[in-house]
Amino acid sequence: MGVYVDAADILVQAGVSAPSAAESAWADTVEDAIEGAIAHALDDGAFTPSTSQTAALTAAAMLDALALFEMRSAPHGVLSITPDGEVARLGADPLRASRTVLYPINPGIG
């Protein structure tokens, strides 16, 4: 169980009532990815959010986790094909919602 998101909560919020092994594993991966990205943005403990910032960050982290969970089955973004026929897809910041909460805590995250 993460500080800001939990794999089981991700599955509930995604509407997955009877997750497959693959869905459960993906939810665990998403939890680790979001938690790791937030820890990195907080400089691995060098910056500590206030109580109100923690509440906002928890909500934003769940939105980010849901977006990342759904991205696996519904890839989106800009798709380009190179002259050699290779697919190039632009990604998105996995902390889109959380970044606005994290920036006042650690302005150095850019």
Located regions from the model:
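Divalent metal-cofactor coordination and adjacent catalytic microenvironments
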Residues: M1-G110
